[in-house]
Each structure stands twice: as structure tokens, then as C-alpha cells.
Amino acid sequence: DPPYNVPVVGHVRLGGNSTHKEFVMASGEMTENQFEGFLTKSLGHSITTAKVGAVVLTLMDWRNLGELQAATTSVGIEQINLCVWVKSNGGMGSLYRSQHELCSICKVPGASHQNNVQLGRHGRYRTNVWNYAGVNTFGRNRKADLVDHPTVKPVAMIEDAIRDVTKHGDVVLDPFGGSGTTLLAAERCRRVGRLIEIDPQYVDVTIRRWQDLTGLEAREQASCETWNERAATLAKGQAIEEGSVEKEADHV
């Protein structure tokens, strides 16, 4: 779920006068060529860890579908379908209010992909139209979800997509981890989630959401500290540093 190169401000609102900060990268500042290059590079890195036959799902806004398709062609993965996420309500828009997002379904060539749908053979009736409530109709947790991330996706939708093309114990990689929806979805269907996220704020959100779901405590590998212990260590270090700065200022 990469950023769509669409500004957050003017396209996503929390409600009232509240707004979100822009994403670290691809938040409307890139040209078409730059964004295509961004997608090509990220997809290229991602598939270096994928086995042949692996399915690559990439969500995208209609504005930049062309750049995504060009990127998938450049890295040599085969598009096998295009799914449409249809939301319950329309969001922001100009001539028409946006009520859908797109999901490119590609495959790493060289082998058949896992297919857990098989035209309903296993009781899973799945089409390329995905009907799931958007964040504007998530329910009582809607505002909390939006506070966590401006473009949070429904966990159930990602969980179903994972179930379609993987087996228990498979590794699911999301190089744009965001608020951790893919990790939660993988946890719920007994897959192994592996996420990369550039923004520390969303890393913390992901860890909190995972802890809330599992009742477990995340630990940093290097220090073996729990997330809460690590936060306390960092806060203590910051307080000491701020105190040193204040003392230096007193002597100026």
C-alpha cells in the first residue's frame, strides 16, 4: 500500500478542522516520471525477496494507475487482474465523489501462484470487486482509526486478500507498513507479517495495534527491551539532553 503521490491536505480530513501531516515521501511532490521511478524502485526491491509464483498486490488511486502499471512492466512482474475496492460511502472528490480504490494483482513469473479461491471450490466466493466499508463508515472506532493514519485500510479486506493467495505460515511482506494493517491481518490468519515503515510515528502505531490485538508485548531485537521499556529509555535520554541544553543556555 504505497503512498499515492496525492497530497493529504485537501484530500483527507479527520473531521472538523483537524488534518494530518503529509507523508514522508510521495505525498504529491513528485512528477509523474518521478513517481513511476519511485514505484519501480520499491517494487524491484520487494520482489528480490519473493519466490517465483508469489502474488504482488498494490493498492493505488485512479490518478496514478498508469505509473503503477508502467512500474510493474519495468520490473517484470505479470499483471493477472485488477481489483476494485468499493466503499460504502463516497469520500472527497470534484465532479464525482471518490468511492473506490484500485488494487493491482500481479505475479512473479516462473511458477503458478497459490489459489485458495478456485471459483468457490473451497467456499470462498471472491470476485475482483471488493465491497468493504471505508474509513468514513468503519463504525465506533472510525475516529481512532483516522487519528492513527489518514488512509488506513480495513483489516478484513487485507486479511481476505492474504487468505486468497497464501498458506498458513507463509511470509507476507509490506514495504509500506503504515499503521500496521497488514501485520494485524497476517496475525489474524496465521501468516507471518514482515513490515517496513520509514516514519517512526507509524512504527509506534503499528506496535501498539499489534499489542492490543494479541495481548503480547513487542521487544526490540537489539536491546531486548519491551516497547514500553524502550519508550521510557528514550524519554529519559531526551530529558537528560534537554536538561544539558538548558544548562548551557544559562551560561550564555
Language model region names:
Residues 207-250:
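S-adenosyl-L-methionine
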